[in-house]
């Protein structure tokens, strides 16, 4: 095949000295004047050649060396499509280019500098002070219409040079620069870069103050398009630019924009007003909206707008309506607003009627094309091409002579489908492996906790044995002497006993050391994340036995028999309990398949036993009185369908409250496709995974060598506490003055558990040991004992320190529940999804007692993912997600809309328990404070004034808290009734289970929708032309920015309405425009 190649250089202005198209510049890229005059050249293409070979050969035709060939690329002359862009050096990825070129029949090619090289020269020209700025900007606007060039230009920070020329330029140079900036901002990448570069947005915002009307008007348009396209990020960028400009000028933010409403140019007024509306629409919070409206009202915005309500321009009237709804400010009377809406609808109706003749012609053309396709699909020898001939000329300039490539394309498409199926199978296997690894990780964490508890018990036993040893030796040292004959015999017996006790204790300590080392080895295996089979082998080789930890009393001999009256040794520790595998009981078995000879359908499976029901799971409301009959028609599928075991809800025709089932939409769907997928057939049962128990590790405790007369645990606790508290006198003073800087919450908790008791005091006094020989805990008890009302004051003080945290926790729990109730009731996406499930379920249950349902209970949502089609591949959840993505694409984000539901962690009874516990501690502290007051302690005046005022305020808070809880509980009961449940169920329902059921379904639904979306994107990417740059523009059409700006002015981009009572009844009519 003979190719015709034309060499083309970038047509840059001849007036630009740095980018002149002189002979000298052309020679620098190895192109002589003679070669430029020769025009195009021809090349004989061999379809077996590689692309690299063909490309280098073409470059040599024009005298371009191989070292400089990387700066060039080939382009189809007809479609302006690059053959290898972005450039691929791997020949395996470019070998198809020659084949496609040969099969397409394209013979005209263009050789030119690649987009990256050309864009770098333009960026350099912008930064060159000697260039002719006006000519550069005039030509740059047209160069930016090429997608590949524009993307490279934006990536090399070319917009910064354009903005500098817009700011500093004058006259036509400034106008051309603004037009080039508009051409850049048509691309998504430019929007992202300028949003993340605050000084660029600030430069753009400063153009609002320009004296040139066109520059000011264009800057306003770019600002509101940027803000609307980038949403919250755009708002933050523009808002910071407005504040920065105002600080630099010493004025208030947005004053310059509001003053433009007095401009004599109507388009400038509309652009300024639109910018303000877009800023309000993209505010992150309603509170911010209110603050902005208040500040703008103080600057005179509302008064200006009231004076401009007579402007009849359509864009201005629409912006007025948007501002009234967003800000809640009534600028016109209700009659005026309705009249404006009516006029706009009349104009739209007139426009619609004018389009009807054209629509009728297009319908006829469509029927003709469909008939031609139908005829072409049949086996015919002759087919008339005249009906479609007029469409082929304008769209296709040249026709391929050989159509054999269609067979190759079909074969490649089949291979792609096979690869996609394999990829899906691999992804499913990866998901199962990830799930298994998570379960094994949870097992390791649980076993590690069990190890730690075992070691804690071993340490405690070690301390007890050591204490027994010390006490025994002390008793031996202070025992009274006897007569000489008895003394000798007793001495011999004592020596044997002492030796026996020392050896036993050494044996115990040795066993403990060996056990600790073994446990450390097992703990190391867990921390190293060994595979389960190796870890299990290590656990089975563990040397830890119960015999190694059997404590030996000082009164037990070597053969295990008690010496005197001793009790039996303590039992060995019991094995650790198995890990509980919570979860619901298994679902009931599916019904048996129908008999081969037909007949009546099998009965539904028996209901689960009462004991196997999940606690708090939504129960089934009664189906209604016998007098209530279904309102929906009976559905009789052509094939026997798999049943969907829901519990239907039949709404009474009258005398009832509003229900969510009155608001759901039941969309249409392909019943034949649905029947093919979900007709009656057996389905497979998944197997569950098993868990393996394991062990834990710990550290060997240290020996306690001090002698203590009080309980060992209390003695140790006091010893640790003494290092953190002041002396006894300082402690008494801190309690009298309620000094939080000396005693913190944790220290007060320890003090309460270690307050000296009468028993401790008498034990120390009765020992008749001198105070100098007592340990620190015993001496502290003697010093602090007798301090009046110590425990009562500490308990009240601790409640004061813990109260705010407890109160805030309860408030947060109530707020989470309140938000969950609000989001669930107001979610439009949830209503649409439930409508799809309802219509599919009624179809599946057609002709049975479960059909003709007005609604269903929510527990059926959990089984949608497990209800498979006849081939056990597609689940009912997949089918629901597919229909939802086709009809309501925005429902994909339902999990984000219901994100507050996952925060509900407690039931209503748990919240009541928390409030009752708070009230109980309050009453205890109140009684303790009363006891301190009645005791008339001279040094407790500060305590009474501090704690007394705190308790008075707390009593009011708890009362308000209980009222708030009652209101939220009533709201939850109303929500449960809103979903069709009876009031008897609503009073006993668990809000945690109720919301978790909805949220878990929405999460699965959103994940499935995202999977569908990714598959569509991958398919679209795979079906696109190889090497083509994606046209990532902000909108379609010849001028995307102007199209998006016009849509924003007409309110067609979904500017939000501020919810609240200020929205008038005409809000629903306003939606007709959007």
Swiss-Prot record:
Every GBD/FH3 domain range: 34-423
DAD domain boundaries: 1037-1073
GO-annotated biological processes: 'de novo' actin filament nucleation; cortical actin cytoskeleton organization; phagocytosis, engulfment; positive regulation of actin filament polymerization; positive regulation of macropinocytosis
MF terms in GO: actin filament binding; profilin binding
Keyword presence, Coiled coil: yes
Compositionally biased tracts (Pro residues): 568-610
Domain of life: Eukaryota
UniProt entry tagged with the keyword Coiled coil: yes
Domain (FH1): residue spans on this chain: 597-623
Keywords carried by this UniProt record: Actin-binding, Coiled coil
Gene3D superfamilies from the UniProt entry: Formin, FH2 domain, Leucine-rich Repeat Variant
Coiled-coil region list: 502-530, 914-971
Domain FH2: 631-1031
Region span, Disordered: 476-507, 549-639, 1053-1074
InterPro entries the UniProt entry points to: ARM-like, ARM-type_fold, FH2_Formin, FH2_Formin_sf, FH3_FHOD1-3-like, GBD/FH3_dom
Compositional bias ranges of the Low complexity kind: 481-503
Family of this protein: Belongs to the formin homology family. Diaphanous subfamily.
Function text: Formins play an important role in the nucleation of actin and the formation of linear actin filaments.
Subunit structure, as described in the record: Interacts (via GBD/FH3 domain) with activated Rho-GTPases.
Domain-related comment: DRFs are regulated by intramolecular GBD-DAD binding where Rho-GTP activates the DRFs by disrupting the GBD-DAD interaction. The DAD domain regulates activation via by an autoinhibitory interaction with the GBD/FH3 domain. This autoinhibition is released upon competitive binding of an activated GTPase. The release of DAD allows the FH2 domain to then nucleate and elongate nonbranched actin filaments.
Stated name of the protein: Formin-G
């Amino acid at each position: 095949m003979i190719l015709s190649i034309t060499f083309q250089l970038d047509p840059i202005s001849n007036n630009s000295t740095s980018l002149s198209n002189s002979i000298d510049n052309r020679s620098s890229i190895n192109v002589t004047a003679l070669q430029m005059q020769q025009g195009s050249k021809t090349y004989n293409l061999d379809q077996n050649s590689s692309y690299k070979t063909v490309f280098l050969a073409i470059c040599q035709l024009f005298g371009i060396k191989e070292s400089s060939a990387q700066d060039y690329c080939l382009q189809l002359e007809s479609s302006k499509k690059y053959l290898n862009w972005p450039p691929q050096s791997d020949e395996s990825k470019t070998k198809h280019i020659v084949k496609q070129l040969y099969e397409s029949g394209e013979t005209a090619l263009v050789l030119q500098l690649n987009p990256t090289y050309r864009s770098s020269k333009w960026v350099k020209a912008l930064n060159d002070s000697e260039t002719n700025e006006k000519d550069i900007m005039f030509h740059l606007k047209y160069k930016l219409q090429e997608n590949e060039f524009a993307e490279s230009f934006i990536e090399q920070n070319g917009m910064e040079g354009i903005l500098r020329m817009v700011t500093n330029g004058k006259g036509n140079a400034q106008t051309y620069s603004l037009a080039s900036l508009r051409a850049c901002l048509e691309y998504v990448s430019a929007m992202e870069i300028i949003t993340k570069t605050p000084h660029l947005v600030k430069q753009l915002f400063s153009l609002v103050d320009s004296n040139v009307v066109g520059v000011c008007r264009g800057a306003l348009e770019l600002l509101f398009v940027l803000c609307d396209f980038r949403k919250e990020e755009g708002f933050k960028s523009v808002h910071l630019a407005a504040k920065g400009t105002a600080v630099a000028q010493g004025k208030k933010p947005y004053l310059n924009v509001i003053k433009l409403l007095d401009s004599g140019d109507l388009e400038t007024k509309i652009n300024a007003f639109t910018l303000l509306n877009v800023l309000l629409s993209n505010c992150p919070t309603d509170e911010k909206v209110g603050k902005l409206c208040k500040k703008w009202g103080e600057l005179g915005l509302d008064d200006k707008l009231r004076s401009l309500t007579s402007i009849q321009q359509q864009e201005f009237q629409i912006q007025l309506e948007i501002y009234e709804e967003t800000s809640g400010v009534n600028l016109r009377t209700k009659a005026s607003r309705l009249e404006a809406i009516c006029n706009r609808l009349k104009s739209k109706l007139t426009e619609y009627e004018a389009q009807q003749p054209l629509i009728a012609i297009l319908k006829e053309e469509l029927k003709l094309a469909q008939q031609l396709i139908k005829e072409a699909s049949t086996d015919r020898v002759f087919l008339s091409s005249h009906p479609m001939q007029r469409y082929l000329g304008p769209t296709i300039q040249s026709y391929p002579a050989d159509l054999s490539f269609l067979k190759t394309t079909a074969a490649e498409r089949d291979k792609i489908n096979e690869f996609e199926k394999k990829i899906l199978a691999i992804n499913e296997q990866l998901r199962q492996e990830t799930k298994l690894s998570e379960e094994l990780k949870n097992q390791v964490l649980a076993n590690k906790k069990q190890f730690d508890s075992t070691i804690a018990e071993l340490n405690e036993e070690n301390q007890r044995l050591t204490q027994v040893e010390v006490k025994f030796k002390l008793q031996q040292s202070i025992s009274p002497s006897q007569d000489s004959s008895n003394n000798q015999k007793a001495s011999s017996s004592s020596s044997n006993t002492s030796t026996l006790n020392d050896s036993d204790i050494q044996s115990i300590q040795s066993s403990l050391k060996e056990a600790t080392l073994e446990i450390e080895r097992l703990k190391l295996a867990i921390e190293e994340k060994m595979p389960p089979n190796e870890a299990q082998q290590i656990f089975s080789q563990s040397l830890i036995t119960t015999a190694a930890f059997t404590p030996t009393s000082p009164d037990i001999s070597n053969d295990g028999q008690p010496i005197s009256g001793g009790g039996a040794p303590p039992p060995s520790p019991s094995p650790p309990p198995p890990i509980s595998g919570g979860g619901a009981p298994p679902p009931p078995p599916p019904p048996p398949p129908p008999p081969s000879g037909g007949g009546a359908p099998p009965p539904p499976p028996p209901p689960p036993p009462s004991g196997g029901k999940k606690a708090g799971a939504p129960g089934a409301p009664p189906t209604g009185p016998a007098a209530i009959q279904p309102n929906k028609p009976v559905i009789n599928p052509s094939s026997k369908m798999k049943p969907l075991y829901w519990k239907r809800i039949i709404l009474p025709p009258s005398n009832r409250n509003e229900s969510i089932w009155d608001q759901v939409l039941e969309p249409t769907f392909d019943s034949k496709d649905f029947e093919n997928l979900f007709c009656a057939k057996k389905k497979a049962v998944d197997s569950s995974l098993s868990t393996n128990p394991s062990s834990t590790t710990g550290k060997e405790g240290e020996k306690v060598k001090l002698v203590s007369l009080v309980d060992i645990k209390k003695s140790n606790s006091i010893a640790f506490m003494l290092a953190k508290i002041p002396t006894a006198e300082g402690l008494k003073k801190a309690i009298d003055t309620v000094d939080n800087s000396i005693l913190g919450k944790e220290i007060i908790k320890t003090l309460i558990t270690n307050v000296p008791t009468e028993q401790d005091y008498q034990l120390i006094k009765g020992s008749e040991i001198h105070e100098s020989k007592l340990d620190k805990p015993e001496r502290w008890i003697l010093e602090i004992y007798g301090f009046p009302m110590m425990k009562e004051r500490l308990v009240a003080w601790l409640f004061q320190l813990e109260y705010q945290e407890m109160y805030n926790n309860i408030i947060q729990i109530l707020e989470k529940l309140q938000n969950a109730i609000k989001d669930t009731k107001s979610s439009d996406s949830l209503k649409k999804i439930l409508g799809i499930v309802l219509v599919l379920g009624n179809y599946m249950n057609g002709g049975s007692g479960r059909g003709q349902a007005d609604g269903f209970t929510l527990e059926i949502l959990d089984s949608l993912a497990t209800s498979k089609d006849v081939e056990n591949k597609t689940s009912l959840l997949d089918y629901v997600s597919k229909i939802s993505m086709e009809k309501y694409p925005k429902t994909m984000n339902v999990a984000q809309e219901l994100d507050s539901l996952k925060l509900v962690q407690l039931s209503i009874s748990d919240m009541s328990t928390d409030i009752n516990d708070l009230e109980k501690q309050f009453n205890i502290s109140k009684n303790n404070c009363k006891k301190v007051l009645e005791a008339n302690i001279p040094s407790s005046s500060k305590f009474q004034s501090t704690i007394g005022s705190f308790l008075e305020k707390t009593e009011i808070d708890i009362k308000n808290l209980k009222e708030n809880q009652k209101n939220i509980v009533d709201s939850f009961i109303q929500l449960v009734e809103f979903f069709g449940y009876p009031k008897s169920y609503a009073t006993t329902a668990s809000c945690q289970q109720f919301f978790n059921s909805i949220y878990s379904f929405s999460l699965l639904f959103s994940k499935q929708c995202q999977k569908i979306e990714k598959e569509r994107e991958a398919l679209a990417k795979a079906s696109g032309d190889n090497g083509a740059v994606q046209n990532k523009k902000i909108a379609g059409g010849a001028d995307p920015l102007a199209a998006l700006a016009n849509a924003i002015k007409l309110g067609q981009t979904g500017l939000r309405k501020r919810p609240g009572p200020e929205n008038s009844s005409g809000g629903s009519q306003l939606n007709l425009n959007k």
